[in-house]
Amino acid sequence: APNQRLCGSHLVEALFLICGERGFYYSPRSGIVEQCCENTCSLYQLENYCN
């Protein structure tokens, strides 16, 4: 899949889909907003935020 720009609820929904039952760590301080909203990120990068 190509890199995507994901912000706000779209970003949270993507994490729910990717991480599933593992859950995820969503904190603006983790850099996920800079990585995935201000820039673009891959599904592989999103998976780094799963628990």
Swiss-Prot record:
Can you tell me which family this protein belongs to?
A: Belongs to the insulin family.
Q: What is its main location?
A: secreted
Is the keyword Secreted assigned to this protein?
yes
**Keyword presence, Lyase:** no
| GO BP annotations listed | glucose metabolic process
The molecular function GO annotations come to:
hormone activity
Q: Where in the cell is it found?
A: Secreted
Primary gene name: INS
Q: Which SMART domains match?
A: IlGF
Extract the Pfam families matched here. Insulin
Which cysteine pairs are covalently linked by disulfides here?
C7-C37, C19-C50, C36-C41
One GO CC term on file: extracellular space
Sections of the chain in a coiled coil: none
Q: What is this protein called?
A: Insulin
The entry's function note states:
Insulin decreases blood glucose concentration. It increases cell permeability to monosaccharides, amino acids and fatty acids. It accelerates glycolysis, the pentose phosphate cycle, and glycogen synthesis in liver.
Q: How does it assemble?
A: Heterodimer of a B chain and an A chain linked by two disulfide bonds.
Q: Which organism is it from?
A: Crotalus atrox (Western diamondback rattlesnake)
**Key words, A-Z:** Carbohydrate metabolism, Disulfide bond, Glucose metabolism, Hormone, Secreted
